[in-house]
Amino acid sequence: MKFLRSVYAFCSSWVGTIVIVLLVIFFIAQAFIIPSRSMVGTLYEGDMLFVKKFSYGIPIPKIPWIELPVMPDFKNNGHLIEGDRPKRGEVVVFIPPHEKKSYYVKRNFAIGGDEVLFTNEGFYLHPFESDTDKNYIAKHYPNAMTKEFMGKIFVLNPYKNEHPGIHYQKDNETFHLMEQLATQGAEANISMQLIQMEGEKVFYKKINDDEFFMIGDNRDNSSDSRFWGSVAYKNIVGSPWFVYFSLSLKNSLEMDAENNPKKRYLVRWERMFKSVGGLEKIIKKENATH
């Protein structure tokens, strides 16, 4: 009984509260706010998320805000406890290779060994399993459009039917921007190689082992792996758990918040306490009524 009273007294103290909060942040969940529109369609600017820190193992604990590791990376994989790897199509929170303190959220398009094409039509995926299993694509992507390049079958937009928030602009602006960068000698600003494939200009990349090709659902308004490269497992942080609060921001185009200040900082009640899957159900329901 005395021990329990001591534990209660410690937990009730300022020091105990700080220790408990840090332990939760280190090993269970951490709060983030989405500032940009790269995942619009699924996650919006102003969505405030709890991120599940144990989805892909336990990352090396870091002190919040200053992102200072509290212990060495003994395994050199960014994780205290190694776990599952992100699967294709999952939404993942990570630190991109060109940053040290910023957290991004994108959808994992491809895993190590996969080949990716970005064309004027959109993204194509060649899963590495199909190199040894000729029926792999037919089994796993039965209704998808496919195209043959270099003697290999690639799947067009493999996650778009399952995840309705994924979308492109009509003229695929990002493809033309990348083409312009590549032809003007600015290849250092993109991670994919511009090649001619069967008379068509395409961007190509093969994903390294234990790396992941992360793309925003808002395909034409996203800084992602097309530009700064694939993400190593050591940079993987976790997965979105649920939206605990959501506000419209100045850049909320759907509400014309930039031109109408009264539309800023409005609560999006319908998004609160929804997981990514829950938000996608709302999208499917809205699409069915239009």
Curated annotation (Swiss-Prot):
One term of GO molecular function: serine-type endopeptidase activity
Keyword Methyltransferase: yes or no? no
UniProtKB keywords: Cell membrane, Hydrolase, Membrane, Protease, Transmembrane, Transmembrane helix
Give the GO biological process terms: signal peptide processing
Q: What is the lineage of its organism?
A: Bacteria, Pseudomonadati, Campylobacterota, Epsilonproteobacteria, Campylobacterales
Task: Give the E.C. number(s).
Answer: 3.4.21.89
Q: Which family does it belong to?
A: Belongs to the peptidase S26 family.
Q: Where would you find the membrane-spanning parts of this chain?
A: 14-34
| Major localisation | membrane
Cellular localisation: Cell membrane
Where are the Cytoplasmic topological domains? Answer: 1-13
Active-site residues (renumbered):
38, 106
**Designated name of the protein:** Signal peptidase I
